[in-house]
Amino acid sequence: MKRRTARERAMQALYQMDITGELEPKVAVENTLDEGEETNEFLESLVVGFVENKEVIDEAIRQNLKKWKLERISIVDRSILRVAVYEMKYMEEIPHNVTINEAIEIAKTFGDEESRRFINGVLSNIKDTL
């Protein structure tokens, strides 16, 4: 599984967890996989890592929102931000610009017209604080 695909699956897993409020991370990951597709370590680390660091990640996002509340952001955008912020804070081997570009590309696919710019702005602000 390519890293872009893993990031997309991680975003989808966090989306499911946000909607249901009770899905276990491994179940959410399994729900995103195509038939016969296997998970990988990168995908699982993104989802489990977010769950283990949810408060820190959400606070980093909150501190960089202007005139928005985290709870009012679309679930898709919130999920993309959460995956990207986890990656930026805890996966130091991945350059921040790569993470931001990947998040923007995922937003183009899954978000609305404004998602791409919104996500770029928030992540750029967070990058400056790390």
From Swiss-Prot:
Give GO MF terms, alphabetically: RNA binding
Kindly list the biological process annotations in GO that this record carries: DNA-templated transcription termination; transcription antitermination
Tell me which GO cellular component terms the UniProt record holds.
Answer: cytosol
In terms of domain of life, where is this protein from?
Answer: Bacteria
**Does Transcription appear among the keywords?**
yes
- Please give the InterPro entries that the UniProt record associates with this protein: NusB-like_sf (IPR035926), NusB_fam (IPR011605), NusB_RsmB_TIM44 (IPR006027)
Against Gene3D superfamilies, the record matches this protein to: NusB-like (1.10.940.10)
Statement: the UniProt record of this protein carries the keyword Lipoprotein: no
Transmembrane region positions? Answer: none
Keywords per UniProt:
RNA-binding, Transcription, Transcription antitermination, Transcription regulation
Which SUPFAM superfamilies does the UniProt entry name for this protein? Answer: NusB-like (SSF48013)
Q: What does this protein do?
A: Involved in transcription antitermination. Required for transcription of ribosomal RNA (rRNA) genes. Binds specifically to the boxA antiterminator sequence of the ribosomal RNA (rrn) operons.
Protein family membership: Belongs to the NusB family.
PANTHER family, from UniProt?
A: ANTITERMINATION NUSB DOMAIN-CONTAINING PROTEIN, N UTILIZATION SUBSTANCE PROTEIN B-RELATED
Q: What is this protein called?
A: Transcription antitermination protein NusB
